[in-house]
Amino acid sequence: MPHPRRYHSSERGSRGSYREHYRSRKHKRRRSRSWSSSSDRTRRRRREDSYHVRSRSSYDDRSSDRRVYDRRYCGSYRRNDYSRDRGDAYYDTDYRHSYEYQRENSSYRSQRSSRRKHRRRRRRSRTFSRSSSQHSSRRAKSVEDDAEGHLIYHVGDWLQERYEIVSTLGEGTFGRVVQCVDHRRGGARVALKIIKNVEKYKEAARLEINVLEKINEKDPDNKNLCVQMFDWFDYHGHMCISFELLGLSTFDFLKDNNYLPYPIHQVRHMAFQLCQAVKFLHDNKLTHTDLKPENILFVNSDYELTYNLEKKRDERSVKSTAVRVVDFGSATFDHEHHSTIVSTRHYRAPEVILELGWSQPCDVWSIGCIIFEYYVGFTLFQTHDNREHLAMMERILGPIPSRMIRKTRKQKYFYRGRLDWDENTSAGRYVRENCKPLRRYLTSEAEEHHQLFDLIESMLEYEPAKRLTLGEALQHPFFARLRAEPPNKLWDSSRDISR
């Protein structure tokens, strides 16, 4: 890339010819040029790397999609998929261009530095409590953000004279989650979600808070298995949300267990709770839109270790399969605007891909994909390309209904009323070798296994109007033994009733 500041404007207007002036400073210019090109190459490489993390197309079209289903590969491959696939919802279309322009502008660093200083001075003048102590005033003066907008904190720091930070639990594009001691709740441990000081993430947090407040209002006793919000506040530009402290996500437990599938009795209990929780949302005219194993957390992820003689390795078995549904940042009420694209790629319903409009049935499709993943240990649709995704659906579930094909605006995926897909290409061979009809994934011919796949098939019905509702799902024969359990025993987080 050319260096726009290679020659200073003052040199152009100096006395003597341009060539003579250049020769007189030739040695110095060479030194400056080599240093500049080296640092620019480093900055350019960092900028390109960061762009690949943000870019949707740079991942969707990569040859890595052709790889076979490697379970460890699947875990890293899906990590940041949601923000890539959402596109404009999370990253402006002109974000990269403005970023490069600013990096090349000579005055950008000084402007950014002055803005940071101004922001810090403004923060130092704020007061969040009339009864603030001298200790909290000293803390307020030291509040700073890192380059990405994360709050800089240390173990032992206090927020709002209430939350004492104990450890970091995780990090995402939105911010970080820390474990805290809540000194107004008798020293109880809570999870505190600290949002980046970036406006689009702060706005998403406000929307999530609105949803969580409605959930608390409708379910004050927290009987419907959605994560409970205790409190929220604005801390120096960072939206903070306090939740009940939970265990690992069902995906992280699966990954830590070498992608060993959950036993069918545990699949049954987790699936039943998931249907119950999401049915509660649907009954209150709310669609989650981002259901996936990462957003389903164990209440307590303690486990027992057993040694598998056949595989010669330790295997984990979670002690309690009680779960909670989390992450309502994308949840949408029926009356609100519906974004064109929702859901993480692997759990995205066909009506979303084909842009036919969506509502609660898209959650049911996601649940079907999740239950399958619990049963086999890997994702059903491992892809990042729309056409390939549709080809996988046809390979596993049969042809897409002609009525959906006629209605969609995405005619580029079809030819003469059928999916435009060549099985003789590398992509075609990949789908043919790694996907098979749904029932061929059965690991046992026992009746309960066939009942499970009957449930999954009903959830993966192409047409939303024909797809199983969650009220109907809870009455499915696969859940018969759980329906016989008293409610107080069914949701007891200290007891595993799935065996």
Swiss-Prot record:
It is found in: Nucleus. One of its GO terms (molecular function) is protein serine/threonine kinase activity. Keywords: ATP-binding, Kinase, Nucleotide-binding, Nucleus, Phosphoprotein, Serine/threonine-protein kinase, Transferase, Tyrosine-protein kinase. One of its GO terms (cellular component) is nucleoplasm. It comes from Homo sapiens (Human). ATP binds at L169, G170, E171, G172, T173, F174, G175, R176, V177, K193. Its main location: nucleus. Belongs to the protein kinase superfamily. CMGC Ser/Thr protein kinase family. Lammer subfamily. Dual specificity kinase acting on both serine/threonine and tyrosine-containing substrates. Phosphorylates serine- and arginine-rich (SR) proteins of the spliceosomal complex. May be a constituent of a network of regulatory mechanisms that enable SR proteins to control RNA splicing and can cause redistribution of SR proteins from speckles to a diffuse nucleoplasmic distribution. Acts as a suppressor of hepatic gluconeogenesis and glucose output by repressing PPARGC1A transcriptional activity on gluconeogenic genes via its phosphorylation. Residues 22-33, 112-127 have a biased composition (Basic residues). This is Dual specificity protein kinase CLK2. It catalyses: L-seryl-[protein] + ATP = O-phospho-L-seryl-[protein] + ADP + H(+); L-threonyl-[protein] + ATP = O-phospho-L-threonyl-[protein] + ADP + H(+); L-tyrosyl-[protein] + ATP = O-phospho-L-tyrosyl-[protein] + ADP + H(+). InterPro entries: CLK_kinases (IPR051175), Kinase-like_dom_sf (IPR011009), Prot_kinase_dom (IPR000719), Protein_kinase_ATP_BS (IPR017441), Ser/Thr_kinase_AS (IPR008271). The gene is CLK2.
